[in-house]
Regions:
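Bacterial N-terminal signal peptides that target proteins for export
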Residues: 1-11
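Acidic/proline-rich low-complexity IDRs
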Residues: 6, 14-15, 294
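A periodicity- and composition-biased signal for non-globular, repetitive helical segments
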Residues: 11-12, 39
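PAS-family sensory domains
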Residues: 12-15, 352
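N-terminal signal peptide c-region/cleavage motif recognized by signal peptidases
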Residues: 17-19
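Subset of outer-membrane beta-barrel
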Residues: 23-437
């Protein structure tokens, strides 16, 4: 099969994956009701088990989309294809109630190859955020003046959507040491939320009255630009330190958001707002230490400047319906990751070529919930990469993750997830074969 045919097959596979991933949301978190949804981990097969570290990772056999400067180090003879999926079991608890949920989702599709010496290209598809929830609350609000029966309200919340990113990037090594790179991404997705509220006199089996509904909807389309740099420092024969940093440019999302309210009197009130969403500026930095091509230890820190970003909120009353573009609903998010990878002998027997990985991460909330800070996130991960054959550079990646999402604010839900991440990294020496042909 020629290189062109293989590239055509890859493009077809990626388009199929894009369609599959865009149809799935993989979430049951009630916290995805706020902001742009729950923010996704965009790490891939090799670094997902390492906590998501990426800034100082530069490897010729891996596609590190979180720092595009790393593309400059891709092996000159290889075409790398990386794809992964996740299985998630969640346990959500709060105020005496417990709910379990199961989800499966395609997590990423990436590829990379070298264009010429010191110049590499990366392309791929990853989810940016996820909206997915369906829950209800029942509250006693008083008693009827005529029957003295209790009046309760049942509110059902439903949401679906999230943002997806299709990106292409290049990494360049202009001179010995320094590498620079950039990703430009096209982002799109749905922002769909609904609220249905019913009042009951004497219980849900009785006739309801004064029902009202709200439906939020927006079809979001925008861009994302990430700029990165890396610099390796050879400490001695056996030790290499690589430092790296990236910056993501924040900007308005110009699409319109619509709020439709259906009142108990049968009226429909519609309100719209433009430029109601915004992406934050993000600054990330980190470093990795590699010892004898066997042990890698890395750590990253990211600051996401969400504070002051725009988000729509409702100003609906009994007779009016309007949207306010608020700038006080977000918090700056701090994200810390650390991880390690060990391989006994990259050129040894099969068992010696298995990668063992560990990682942890911590993130503060980016949204406020009823004026209080949202949940913090804690994660512990472990995994392996198994060679497909004795001498192959292609691997099967597998890792498990425990994610704990909780807030110090009373009354908020605590979420615990056990996740299994499975992926494959194909590393074929296409261009070497072409040379012999």
């Amino acid at each position: 099969m020629t290189i062109i045919k293989r590239l055509s097959s890859f493009v077809a596979a990626m388009l199929l994956a894009v369609g599959t991933m865009a149809q799935s949301n993989g979430s049951n978190s009630s916290y995805s009701r706020f902001g742009l949804g729950t923010l996704n981990d965009q790490s891939t097969g090799f670094n997902r088990a390492m906590g998501g570290v990426a800034q100082g990772i530069q490897d010729g056999n891996k596609v590190n989309m979180l720092n595009p400067a790393s593309y400059s180090a891709i092996d000159s003879l290889s075409f790398i294809f990386d794809a992964g999926m996740g299985l998630q079991y969640g346990r959500l608890s709060g105020e005496g109630a417990k709910v379990t949920a199961f989800n499966a989702t395609l997590e990423y599709v990436n590829a990379g190859f070298r264009l010429k010496r010191g110049l590499g290209l990366g392309i791929g598809f990853v989810p940016y955020s996820t909206i997915g929830y369906n829950f209800n609350t029942t509250t006693r609000v008083g008693s009827s003046y005529t029957s003295s029966q209790s009046i309760t309200t049942k509110t059902t919340y439903y949401g679906n959507g999230g943002l997806h990113e299709l990106y292409i990037g290049m990494g360049w090594n202009p001179f010995a040491g320094l590498s620079i790179g950039a990703n430009i991404g096209y982002m799109w997705g749905d922002y769909d939320h609904s609220l249905a509220q019913n009042f009951y006199e004497g219980g849900e089996s009785s006739k309801n009255y004064n029902a009202q509904n709200e439906v939020w909807s927006s079809n979001l389309k925008t861009y994302k630009l990430d700029i990165g740099a890396q610099y390796p420092i050879k400490l001695n024969k056996n030790n290499l330190l690589t430092i790296g940093a990236t910056m993501s440019l924040g900007h308005d999302i110009k699409n319109e958001v619509k709020l439709i309210r259906y009142t108990s009197q049968g009226d429909t009130i519609t309100s719209t707002a433009k430029k109601a969403f915004e992406l934050p500026y993000i600054i990330s930095a980190g470093a990795s230490w590699k010892h004898k091509e066997q042990l890698t230890i890395a750590a990253d820190y990211s600051l996401e400047r969400w504070d002051g970003c725009k988000v729509p909120v409702s100003l609906a009353t009994a007779t009016e319906n309007s949207i306010k573009v608020a700038t006080d609903q977000y918090l700056n998010r701090h994200h810390i990751t650390a991880g390690a990878e060990y391989i006994n002998n990259p050129l040894g027997k099969y068992r010696q070529r298995i990668y063992y990985r560990l990682g942890v991460s911590y993130a503060t909330p980016y949204v406020k919930i009823n004026g209080h800070d949202g949940p913090n996130e804690y994660s512990i991960r472990a995994g392996v990469a198994l060679p497909m054959t004795i001498r192959s550079k292609s691997f099967i990646n597998a890792s498990v993750e425990w994610l704990h999402r909780t807030s110090s604010t009373s009354g908020l839900i605590t979420e615990n997830y056990l996740m299994l991440h499975l992926g494959v990294t194909f590393n074929e020496r296409w261009f070497e074969k072409l040379r012999f042909q």
